[in-house]
Amino acid sequence: MDRETFREQLLAVMEKKVHWAWPMFTSGLVRKDRLHLHFEQEYETYVRDFPILVGRAYVRCPIPEIRRSLAENLYEEETGGLVAGSPHPLLFLEYPRGLGMDLKRFEQVELLPAAKRYRRFLDDATQHFGWDIAAAVVTIFVEGSSDERSALELKEQKPPAPLEEHPLVKYYGLPVARLALTKAHRQVEGSHRAAAWDAILNHVLPMRRGAVVRTMNEALDLWSAYRDAVAETCGLTRPIAGAEPAVDSLAEVA
């Protein structure tokens, strides 16, 4: 597989990383008393241990240049020492804390079956395969979004909405001060995306590119099933084409 084909196939995977329920999460249609389920599953599935996932990719990587980039990523995720000022998993908990949720719930989260499968995949991808698969899954798939093409092609991007317009602030009353993680992500996003794509496109051996793409497609399938399960648990129903988004009959917009 040549480099351009590799690039386009990876971008095709990422452009499918769009979930039908996300517009409901970002428009206040999820009941406030069920929103904790989303946060708990995200935290337990990958947020809490994301520094560990990055660390596994670092340990497996034989290329000093990429290790240095992963080490910087790991240091920021684990300590917040470069930008955020606090470990990113702890800053994530500021969302539920600011919404008045019981943080003890996050100490013993029972993962949904689909979440367990996705987490098992993340563990396998970062422990049992090559550095290339570990780095691609962690730094491109997990950290990345459906808009990777804009970041990769350095297109002029629309500036993000003010923090005051963040859905958790606008619809659920989260204090803006609790968005420290969102603010940090905005500060480091550009450099992280560039480093991640440089590592994969310029250092993965041609004979390994097919395996990386196949694993990324597997990540997409498992992630989609995981988000389906979270949406269902939060009372959301996949909308029929042309219909209004559906939530359960008890739903109320916060």
What are these regions (language model features)?
Residues 1-254:
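Non-heme di-metal
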